[in-house]
Amino acid sequence: MSSGAGKVYKVLVVDDSALMRKILVEILNQSPCLEVVDTAGDPYQARDKIKALSPDVITLDVEMPRMDGLTFLRNLMRLRPMPVVMISSLTEQGAAVTLDALEYGAVDFIAKPKIDLREGIEEKAQEIIDKVITAARIPHDKLLLKQQRLQTQHQKAAVGERPQPVFATTDKLIAVGASTGGLDAIRDLLDGLNMDLPGIVIAQHIPGAFSRSFAERLDRRLPMKVEEAYDNAPITMGRVYIAPGEYHLEVVRTGAKYVCRLSEAPPVNRHRPSVDVLFDSIVSAAGANAMAALLTGMGKDGAAGLLRLHEAGAYTIAQDEASSVVWGMPGAAVKLNAADDVLPLEKIAASVKRWYAENPG
């Protein structure tokens, strides 16, 4: 994230809660890279202040009076695309609306705690600062590219009745890790795959209330079965397993099959689920029988794990910088020479299918 280093980014905080506005202003102004230029209590105030102040990034509450945050976001992305970080409640409804917001163009989200708002948010201060700075630094052309991809996705109809999956085990395994921008990237990647592939395990940095909604949403629109991973779940052909938020996902080999293992061990690289934890478990469980892709994301989680997979003989891919919303995790992997191939997102699915065609099992 060196580009834009030294610049001070203008932030507009949009939230109907005066307390939340106050807390966010205090947190964001702690960073020398950020300046909160104003706040707005509803989308109509926000619209006027965006015109007057031209902020670099806005934080936007999902639930607001007069016009809900989702409607405002859709209008904003249609008329004036800009980086938006959503502020969402940790509820099932909040998760569903936030996933909608990411599909309509929001870059990332921050989950509000259900209780003890001030203490809970202040514990996330560094995460909030990092996410807002990361969003502000996204080039305008990448925002436009994201919008184009989303429009293409919206034009695709939901899947009809899917064929029954074959509950067959396999020697092969596919792993994916992602963070910021990863929800869109994972959806696009899976959209290019099919049921005739080994089981796919995914670690995406996501809170607990969101992972199930994300898995259910993918399951409705993709031909393969997508589910939130559970402890001892057998990993079978044509199925996708999403790590549940607040749990590490590991893969272990039991006899002739792979199974999921969940753990509440401490966060790794500040994350649980951690991509490194998933990848490291696959080094032991599958080694050269695996392939792994590290997609867009902030930080370096997964880079060291991808290197260890590479050294174990697995086929490894890092998403390229041009197609990544944030080239943190895959960029760190490239610096470690952990990737066999560095590919744009739209070419990764074809490489996964080619790898399996050349290495069936």
Curated annotation (Swiss-Prot):
Residues 10-127 form the Response regulatory domain. The keyword Hydrolase applies. One of its GO terms (biological process) is chemotaxis. The modification 4-aspartylphosphate is found at residue 61. GO terms for molecular function: phosphorelay response regulator activity; protein-glutamate methylesterase activity; protein-glutamine glutaminase activity. PANTHER family: PROTEIN-GLUTAMATE METHYLESTERASE/PROTEIN-GLUTAMINE GLUTAMINASE, PROTEIN-GLUTAMATE METHYLESTERASE_PROTEIN-GLUTAMINE GLUTAMINASE. This is Protein-glutamate methylesterase/protein-glutamine glutaminase 1. It comes from Hahella chejuensis (strain KCTC 2396).
